[in-house]
Amino acid sequence: MIRSGTLLTLPAIAAFVVGGVVLCGVAVVAMRTTAVSTAAPIALEELGKRVLVIAPHPDDEVIATGGTIHRLVAAGVGVKVVLVTAGDSYLRAAARIAEGSPSATSYLQLGDIRHRESLAAAVRLGLRATDVVSLGYSDGTTQAMWDASWDESTPARGRTEATRVPYAWAARPDAPICGQRLAADLESVISDFAPDTVIAPDPYETNADHAMTAAFATYAMDAVGYAGRRLSSVVHFRHYPYPWAHLPGTALNPPPQLLSPDTTWLALPLDAADKEAKATAIAEYGSQTAIADLGLYMRAFIRTNELFASRAPARLLVRNDDSRPSRDESATIAATPAPVVPIPVGSTRPRINAIRMARGPRTLWIGLRCDASVTSTGTFTVGLRLFGGEAPARLDISVRGTEATTTAEASNSIAPEGVRAEVDGDTLWVAVPVDALAGRTRCMVGASVERTGGSPMRAAWREVDL
């Protein structure tokens, strides 16, 4: 949408035209087949006897997996759903309640409404109220919980103004809104329910709560040593699904930008009863479907199949020396999907295109390959979450130019000596002494860059076998 006051220069007009053409092309590619998905078929039996669905907000469990849940329950499979947040900070929905500018009270009312909607939707899918675990954390706070609000002493605050879970219906009322608590909640559910399959959001989703719920789910699974099947689902990724239309006879295909050698896309077929159950469950979320474009968006996920991605942990490249590796001497851990519309010349840069890693006898190298030369104008952060041996630990590194500093963000932070940074054209390399990884078998790695005049650009958190 072009806002009032937008300056329509020739480059801007060209960008709009190019964007429209590219988006149309993406839609055509995504819809090339009609009733059968391009993803590999997966049989219901392959999911096992117990399936755990972890969703960021009430309604995501239906949008991503509603038909699958209905099929599983009908087949006698045990299903449990965890709703991480209360979905209480959606401005447009809260404004409808307030009939104007929403207050903290309006957001709390929205949280209560969406909780009731989630229970009604669960019934439509064949679940019982006891199959739904509503954690009640504040919508929009998961990024803060993962970063600076990890400890109970530094809770996050959302639009409800609460720093503790404010809902009596939550699994743990009055729990501090912090990453440590959320991770423990997920670890407890995984350990107690012992699922054969866990379905969580995809790490490449473009909504922060979705991407960070993916990170928290991975963290919890790695913390408890979960060895079952891990699948992810996509709800928010740019203009996905293609197109935004109610097309129940059309297949759901993977976003073309997320096709990669390290990802296997799987399609679970839905029958008429599954699609009908999903449609009625979506309709229970009246606080969302009443918003015209959102209702259409939700119904666009009622297709002939539901879609899941399977990714194995990445493996870093092992080298015989500790010198800074070249691009060919490192392994790609996370590749940022290319933008649908090319970035205009002169826009805020750099962007992180990929995270690469290599390990020598004494040094772990983490490379952030960017779309422009790395200069001292941006501040990069590199994060590691370490598993195996002792309790999980975290290492947070801030880099400006070639000055690298470890930061103590949480009580489980470590600060090894000898961390340093080097720049090689479009790649920032961070060196971490291998001694800091002693006893660790797996890590999660993520990165971001704060660009001048722009919001931080974040690369997806991915797990790596060490």
Question: In which residue ranges do the predicted regions lie?
Answer:
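C-terminal accessory domains and tails appended to enzymatic cores
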Residues: 2-5, 19, 27-38, 143-153, ...
